[in-house]
Amino acid sequence: MIGKLVRDLKIPDQRHPEKAHRPDNVQPKKPSWIRVKAPTSEGYKETRDIIRGQKLATVCEEAGCPNVGECWSQGHATMMIMGEICTRGCSFCNVATGRPQALDAFEPGRVAHAVSQLGLKHVVVTSVDRDDLEDGGAEHFAQTIRAIRHRAPATTIEVLVPDFLKCGPSALETVVAARPDVFNHNLETVPGLYPEVRPGARYFHSLRLLQRAKELDPSIFTKSGIMVGLGEDRQGVLQVMDDMRSAEVDFLTIGQYLQPTPKHHRVDRFVTPEEFAGYEKAAYGKGFLMVSATPLTRSSYHAGDDFARLRDARQKRLGA
């Protein structure tokens, strides 16, 4: 872990070569509601050892998630498949950019083994973008889902997928056909900020991906999230909510953007807890089954508990 931190701090240009030419953005001091304790618990160490033992990557580490100490201490980790190197270079993201290695055919089995070792009731599996692959890694996702089902049949599975922008429709169909319990794809920000924040993606393509997943399997829960503090305004966030609901998204997450390095997109401002509470109220008013909107909310934060509440919310709505 220490070696990894040293790598990230000493040679950021190797991790993010596409950002090396950018001027440094001043990182504002974090308010009290953002600060978290350093991970030190035995549970954290046990989770780390299992992940290391299976030679797996986690988005918790690669993206520099502020909740890693809390989640890992409880034995929760978000598996990141298909390597640690992404083919995109989004200005908000701390995952390394470059040329990925070939897929590891044994990775799905190792993920399933780790899920079993950790005793997870709910697992989140995500990935880097793999624009170098014809199917964007869809079959690898499907293999991972099937491996977890075989090894840990009682575990519910959530996938947080890339946009499959350069693939045919069969990529999405492959993932949905593997029957994950939750299909998650993040819109990340308001459409007006895409050219700067998410230049390799297309807002309405991502929105349609979520809509089509629900069309392919109406029983699947769909989920999406955005960050705030990137330069958006409240009306833009409310419009994204409306767009998601038009695509029948069930679960919305909203969290504060935190700038990984001075070369990344600047933090425009820190959104207050009161504003997050306002977003949560507005989202429930628009019909979302489940909403998580706090400064430290991330896609997989408390995902297991939230899935149970999501399932209950659907049952109540169907029974109403």
UniProtKB/Swiss-Prot annotation:
Single GO molecular function: lipoate synthase activity
Protein location: Cytoplasm
Stored InterPro entries: Aldolase_TIM, Elp3/MiaA/NifB-like_rSAM, LIAS_N, Lipoyl_synth, rSAM
Recorded metabolic or biological pathway in which this protein acts: Protein modification; protein lipoylation via endogenous pathway; protein N(6)-(lipoyl)lysine from octanoyl-[acyl-carrier-protein]: step 2/2
A Pfam family per the record: LIAS_N
Source domain of life: Bacteria
Gene Ontology cellular-component terms listed: cytoplasm
Keywords: 4Fe-4S, Cytoplasm, Iron, Iron-sulfur, Metal-binding, S-adenosyl-L-methionine, Transferase
Amino-acid positions noted as binding [4Fe-4S] cluster 2 in the UniProt annotation, renumbered to this chain: C86, C90, C93
Amino acid composition bias (Basic and acidic residues), ranges on this chain: 1-24
Major location (coarse): cytoplasm
Region (Disordered), start-end ranges: 1-30
Co-factor: note: Binds 2 [4Fe-4S] clusters per subunit. One cluster is coordinated with 3 cysteines and an exchangeable S-adenosyl-L-methionine.
The EC number(s) this enzyme carries: 2.8.1.8
Residue span, Radical SAM core domain: 72-289
Binding site for [4Fe-4S] cluster 1: C60, C65, C71, S300
SMART domains listed in its UniProt record: Elp3
Cofactor(s) annotated in UniProt: [4Fe-4S] cluster
Reaction equations catalysed: [[Fe-S] cluster scaffold protein carrying a second [4Fe-4S](2+) cluster] + N(6)-octanoyl-L-lysyl-[protein] + 2 oxidized [2Fe-2S]-[ferredoxin] + 2 S-adenosyl-L-methionine + 4 H(+) = [[Fe-S] cluster scaffold protein] + N(6)-[(R)-dihydrolipoyl]-L-lysyl-[protein] + 4 Fe(3+) + 2 hydrogen sulfide + 2 5'-deoxyadenosine + 2 L-methionine + 2 reduced [2Fe-2S]-[ferredoxin]
Family: Belongs to the radical SAM superfamily. Lipoyl synthase family.
NCBIfam families from the UniProt entry: lipA, PRK05481.1, PRK12928.1
Protein name: Lipoyl synthase
